[in-house]
């Protein structure tokens, strides 16, 4: 039992030599993100006799609680659109296929969902219960541990979300400007300390490193795809620098949200991704066609919730699109942004009448009809 706990907490074999016979066969022991999946599976294994299927079901269950938390959060903002939002959060194929097995992505969907829910409860509803604060800390830690780059898209979008939500309640122009500048200052200082605190981890996801890695990955996967008839994609030549990478911003976003195209699919699983991408293309065209491009973006910029979805989706889509270069990997990496982008489309398409106004949301003490699964 003692050795099991030491393995669970990734004790160094220098401090605990008894773990060495076990970790010598685990090459992922020194990768905290990968090992966290195995550690969580080991805990679930206590409840299931270390049988894979029950462990996978537990992963799927907890992932669903996060997705459900996201769904209920947005339903309380747009109660008339509960059916349309259900499609966005609960029925996107990639989300429940890649977010319901023993994967890093499954844990991240759990954490991201509860991070959205608790952030909304704490900062908008002002519900500072111990449960919400603990869930917020846990979800933030899990995302940081397993896929910290999600935070690089989430934190800016969250800051804008909170800024626009709170500033909309201030009627005096001067006070609104002062509060906005104060918020930006505090957010900037907080982001600075965040980057300093996690400088080593964030360095792997700096723009310079991403640019260099993207160029290397592009060349390698292009070679492999040519030799093995693989599912790689190419965004074209670009200089491995920040400026060169930014020039591929539109292509990277498009490949994440709207590709592969049907003629690019060489495998059944890629064809399914292509069909899903066609659905995204269709609803995107319909949403902007119905209201017009100018009115659609005006609606996005005026609604803090839509603006959050837009910023997070676009930043995240760019990050994974510029660095994956393989449709198979991309279909898994992109799932955190899909519900937010599609929910934005649903609101643009079907929000006709007034929903809950922001003051009602802020004063709301409890999200109705939501039953926590944990």
Predicted regions span which residues?
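Juxtamembrane segments of multi-pass membrane glycosylation machinery
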Residues: 15-58, 258-265
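Membrane-interface helix-loop-helix junctions at transmembrane boundaries of multi-pass membrane enzymes
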Residues: 76, 125-131, 285-311
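Membrane-interfacial entry segments at the cytosolic side of transmembrane helices
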Residues: 128-133, 167-184
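Transmembrane-helix motifs of polytopic, lipid-linked glycan transferases
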Residues: 41-43, 55-77, 282
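Short acidic/glycine- and proline-prone juxtamembrane loop motifs at membrane-interface regions
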Residues: 101-106
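Membrane-interface alpha helices of multi-pass inner-membrane proteins
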Residues: 96-97, 131-154
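Hydrophobic, aromatic-rich transmembrane alpha-helices
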Residues: 66-69, 252, 256-261, 272-299
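Transmembrane-helix signature of polytopic, membrane-embedded enzymes
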Residues: 53, 70-91
């Amino acid at each position: 039992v003692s050795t099991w706990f030491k393995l669970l907490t990734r004790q160094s074999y220098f401090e605990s030599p008894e773990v060495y016979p076990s970790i010598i066969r685990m090459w992922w022991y020194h990768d905290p993100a990968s090992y966290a999946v195995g550690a969580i599976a080991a805990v679930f294994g206590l409840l299931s006799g270390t049988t894979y299927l029950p462990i996978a079901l537990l992963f799927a269950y907890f992932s669903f609680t996060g997705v459900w938390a996201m769904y209920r959060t947005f339903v309380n903002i747009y109660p008339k659109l509960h059916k349309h939002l259900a499609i966005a959060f609960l029925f996107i194929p990639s989300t429940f296929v890649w977010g319901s097995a023993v994967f890093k992505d499954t844990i991240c969907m759990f954490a991201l969902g509860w991070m959205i829910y608790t952030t909304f409860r704490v900062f908008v509803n002002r519900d500072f219960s111990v449960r919400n604060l603990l869930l917020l800390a846990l979800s933030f830690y899990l995302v940081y541990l397993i896929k910290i780059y999600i935070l690089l898209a989430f934190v800016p979008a969250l800051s804008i979300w909170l800024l626009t939500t709170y500033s909309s309640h201030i009627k005096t122009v001067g006070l609104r400007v002062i509060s906005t500048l104060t918020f930006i200052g505090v957010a900037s200082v907080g982001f600075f300390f965040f980057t300093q605190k996690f400088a080593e981890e964030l360095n792997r996801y700096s723009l310079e490193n991403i640019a260099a890695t993207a160029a290397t990955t592009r060349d390698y996967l292009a070679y492999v795809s040519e030799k093995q008839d693989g599912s790689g994609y190419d965004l074209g030549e670009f200089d491995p620098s920040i400026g060169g990478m930014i020039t591929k911003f539109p292509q990277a976003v498009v490949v994440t949200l709207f590709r592969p195209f049907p003629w690019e699919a060489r495998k059944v699983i890629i064809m399914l991704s292509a069909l899903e991408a066609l659905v995204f293309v269709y609803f995107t065209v319909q949403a902007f066609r119905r209201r017009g491009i100018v009115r659609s973006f005006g609606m996005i910029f005026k609604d803090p919730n839509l603006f959050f979805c837009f910023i997070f989706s676009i930043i995240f889509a760019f990050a994974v699109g510029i660095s994956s270069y393989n449709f198979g990997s991309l279909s898994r990496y992109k799932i955190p942004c899909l519900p937010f982008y599609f929910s934005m489309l649903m609101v643009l398409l079907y929000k006709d009448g007034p929903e809950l106004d922001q003051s009602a949301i802020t004063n709301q003490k409890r999200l109705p009809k939501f039953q926590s699964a944990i």
